[in-house]
Every structure is written in C-alpha cells, then in structure tokens.
Amino acid sequence: SDAIAPAISAANSKGTPVICLGIKANSGDFTFVGSENYDAGHMQGEYMAEHLEQGAKVLYLAGTAGLQHSADRRQGFQDALEEAGRSDITILADQDGDYVKDEAMRICDAWIQTYAHGGKADFDAIVCANDQMALGAVESLKGAGLLTNAGEILITGVDGSDDGLNAVNEGYMCQTVLQDAAGQAKATHEVLEKLKNGETPDKEIIVPFQSVTKDNVADYLK
C-alpha cells in the first residue's frame, strides 16, 4: 500500500520501529506480520478446480479496485485454475463488490437477471474475495429461489468469520479461507517482545491461511 508509506517514513526518521499488520507498505523499513492474500485466492481456485464439473461457469466477486490484496486474491484464484489445467472453466463475470455484503447482493441480483432463466441458474459457482460478499451472494440466491437446497451453487469466501463458518456448516457456502487473526496477533506480540529485548525481528512473518470446508468446519466452530 502507498497510503501508509508516509507514516512509515516519518517513523523511520525518528528511529521508531514499525510493524505492518495485514497490509504491506510499498516502501520504508518495517516488519510485516500477516498472510499472503495470493494464497487465499489460490486455495479458492484449488477447491473449485477439484469440485466443479467440466465446462463449469463461475461468477467472481472481487474486493476493491486498486487495493493490492484484492488483486492478489484474484490472481491466486486464476493461477490455481490454470495450474490445475481447468481452462474449461469460464469466468462469466468479474466485478468489484468492495467487500460489502449489500453491494454483493446488488451485484448478484443483477447477475441473476442476466445469467438465470426459468428459475435455473446458468452458472455453477460464485467465488468471493471475502465472507461478507459470499453471504450476500447466498441471500441473493435464496431470494431468487436458486438456492433452495444447500450446495446447489458453490459459494466460497475468505476470512473464516463466524457467519462464514456457520454458512459452511449449513452447506450454503462450500468453503471459507480462514485468516488467522489470533495467529497474527500472537506473531505481532512476539515481534514486540523481540524489539523490547533489543533483538532484530524477521522482516516478514507469514501466518498461513487455512481452507475450511464441510470436512473440517467442526474444528473451527465455537
């Protein structure tokens, strides 16, 4: 991100250590603690490559245009399909939902007008860059009568939010890619302890994403 670069530069000039949690800066001296957003998208692509039938059609709900993590998640998804040799999968539409549930519902409502006929969807999956948009997609499809049975259309999100995990457990979402907030907090604390002790922390500490599906969701439910 360019937006936080000036603040990092100011801190660097005063000799103040900087930790970037979740978002990398494009310049400056800092320790990054977080997850690789590319990996989240790649996990979504891996799931779809394995579970979608030949010739499947997909709708993609991206995050916010111009944000690197949005681009990384999309790229990871696309690369996973390519690596799996799934050139038969068609991306019917790709639109920015800004990570907002209501915006995702609005977009999905419009997609349904275009890609559903006679009460039947002409698409097999909706891949979303976060859980809120995935939940919006679920509500939109339910409202249109296209998701009367769980799992009719594969819907995946990112975050591993409580609502996302519940939707996976109920079968309305096939996957959420968990962003391990607790793991990131623990890693950040460890960096702070090193700084307090006069040690030099690693420049980058990656906390892996985790793919959550019906097969392992029970391990994550509270």
Where are these regions (language model features)?
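Hinge/beta->alpha junction and helix N-cap segments in small-molecule ligand-binding domains
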Residues: 1, 23, 32-43, 60-82, ...
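Flexible loop/hinge segments that line or gate small-molecule binding clefts
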Residues: 2-39, 43, 50, 57, ...
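Pocket-flanking alpha-helical
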Residues: 2-9, 100-117, 132-143, 161-169
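Short helix-capping segments at alpha-helix termini
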Residues: 11-16, 81-89, 117-120, 142-151
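Venus flytrap/periplasmic-binding-protein-like
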Residues: 19-22, 128-131, 135-173, 212-213
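Hinge/cleft segment of the Venus flytrap/periplasmic-binding protein
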Residues: 69, 80-84, 180-222
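Local beta-strand N-terminus motif with an aromatic residue
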Residues: 121-123, 173
